[in-house]
């Protein structure tokens, strides 16, 4: 993942108490961001909510809103709610303006979102590294709605601005992610190498390198970096997710299941994470585990994807009638931009199953 927290740029001599308070707050932000990177979304939200309870600043509301965008399936409604609260406190808050533009990007309103992000850059006069970074990051967050070339421009500007205080590893992670989106693995790996020079937890770097090697079908190097990530920090959940994906490629069913068990163990029990785990179990044909995991959080998540997953599971059980009902509910609730071609494929096989049952009954 790709995150950044700001530290005070100017500290007035003699304001020791203010400095200590700001430092403690920054440390807390850092802790929250580390949890986001580790796929511990519930813990991160808990931290950001605690920050708001102590100090309801525009920045703190931004981080909470951002956590809802960072989870596997973004919750745009709750993200917007927090960005709006941040802007109510400070109408000029660049971060919360970026947050709202990011929501538009996620919903497919690309031209409008980029125009708003560009306006924020203009208003800030491109003086703040964090603002530049967040704009660049926003342009990489959504698979089908992004602008990696523009992201690279903004992130490089952020890196240049941050040199004086030290460039955070998160900047380089995101730069690498942007290069990956442009299908430039060489520069992506270079960015990850630069991240490894400053990262406190190198497991995060090895994980990203592993997924990059996997995408390039360099499986030996992918495996080496997965092992490095786990050996560096055995509690770093994303490494086990990468390991599960690696084992799945080689059709190692039992090993994939064990990797998913470990991922579940070290990620937290945030409902959005559990929904992701249910999907991973389904992909691995662990249908019983997928159903059990989905059932535990079905009423706790608002993401319409839950209806589609349940439809898949019911289709697998030849329960075509309920599968049809859940798929129809999914269509009724989901953003149109999230509907993918395979959804029509599921619909077709469900109707084929219903037709077959009717024929048998006749």
Model-derived regions, located:
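Alpha-solenoid helical repeat scaffolds
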Residues: 15, 19-362
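Bacterial N-terminal signal peptides that target proteins for export
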Residues: 2-15
């Amino acid at each position: 993942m790709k995150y950044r927290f700001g530290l005070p740029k100017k500290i007035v001599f003699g304001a020791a108490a203010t400095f200590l308070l700001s430092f403690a707050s920054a440390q807390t932000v850092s802790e929250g961001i580390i949890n986001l990177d580790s796929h511990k979304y519930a813990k991160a939200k808990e931290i950001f909510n605690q920050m708001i309870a102590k100090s309801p600043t525009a920045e703190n509301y931004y981080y909470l809103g951002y956590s809802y965008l960072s989870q596997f399936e973004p919750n745009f409604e709750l993200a917007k709610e927090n960005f709006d609260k941040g802007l109510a406190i400070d109408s000029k808050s660049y971060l919360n303006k970026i947050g709202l533009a990011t929501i538009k990007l996620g919903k497919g309103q690309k031209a409008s979102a980029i125009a708003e992000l560009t306006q924020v850059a203009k208003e800030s006069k491109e003086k703040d590294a964090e603002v530049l970074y967040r704009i660049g990051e926003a342009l990489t967050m959504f698979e089908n709605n992004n602008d990696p070339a523009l992201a690279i421009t903004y992130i490089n500007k952020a890196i240049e601005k941050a040199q004086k205080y030290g460039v955070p590893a998160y900047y380089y992670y995101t730069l690498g992610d942007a290069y990956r989106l442009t299908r430039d693995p060489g520069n992506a790996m270079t960015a990850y190498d630069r991240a490894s020079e400053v990262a406190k937890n190198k497991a995060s770097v090895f994980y990203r390198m592993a997924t990059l090697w996997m995408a390039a079908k360099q499986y030996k190097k992918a495996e080496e970096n997965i092992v490095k990530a786990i050996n560096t920090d055995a509690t770093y959940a994303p490494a086990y997710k990468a390991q599960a994906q690696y084992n799945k490629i080689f059709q190692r069913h039992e090993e994939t299941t064990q990797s998913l068990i470990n991922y579940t163990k070290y990620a937290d029990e945030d409902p959005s994470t559990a929904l992701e785990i249910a999907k991973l179990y389904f992909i691995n044909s662990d249908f019983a585990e997928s159903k059990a995991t989905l059932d535990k959080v079905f009423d706790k998540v608002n993401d319409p994807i839950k209806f589609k997953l349940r439809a898949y599971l019911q289709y697998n059980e030849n329960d075509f009638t309920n599968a049809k009902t859940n798929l129809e509910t999914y269509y009724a609730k989901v953003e149109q931009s999230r509907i993918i071609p395979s959804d029509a494929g599921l619909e077709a096989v469900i109707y084929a199953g219903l037709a077959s049952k009717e024929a048998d009954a006749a």
